[in-house]
């Protein structure tokens, strides 16, 4: 199929494979929706610390993948 976009639930990542750290759900929701997701929230005490998790994030937006954060 061409022209079909899919979405996934994931930690949104910066270009260096680092997550966006957070403290408030509202900041993550704003970041996620600005990048085309349905919504987002701050995942507290998760695998990557307190980080933004997005719901239905488009495929063209980077997500945290296996490997180290390259700061």
Swiss-Prot record:
Signal peptide as annotated in the record: 1-6
Disulfide bonds: 18-69, 22-42, 28-52, 32-54
GO terms, molecular function: sodium channel inhibitor activity; toxin activity
Compartmental location: Secreted
Tissue/organ expression: Expressed by the venom gland.
Proregion residues excised on maturation: 71
InterPro entries referenced in this protein's UniProt entry, alphabetically: LCN-type_CS_alpha_beta_dom (IPR044062), Scorpion_toxin-like (IPR003614), Scorpion_toxin-like_sf (IPR036574), Scorpion_toxinL (IPR018218), Scorpion_toxinL/defensin (IPR002061)
Limits of the LCN-type CS-alpha/beta domain: 8-70
Biological process per Gene Ontology, one example term: defense response
Keywords in alphabetical order: Disulfide bond, Ion channel impairing toxin, Neurotoxin, Secreted, Signal, Toxin, Voltage-gated sodium channel impairing toxin
Cellular component, GO, one term: extracellular region
Keyword match Signal: yes
Taxonomic superkingdom: Eukaryota
Main location group: secreted
Domain notes: Has the structural arrangement of an alpha-helix connected to antiparallel beta-sheets by disulfide bonds (CS-alpha/beta).
Function: Alpha toxins bind voltage-independently at site-3 of sodium channels (Nav) and inhibit the inactivation of the activated channels, thereby blocking neuronal transmission.
Membership in a protein family: Belongs to the long (4 C-C) scorpion toxin superfamily. Sodium channel inhibitor family. Alpha subfamily.
Protein name, per record: Sodium channel neurotoxin MeuNaTxalpha-12
Organism: Mesobuthus eupeus (Lesser Asian scorpion)
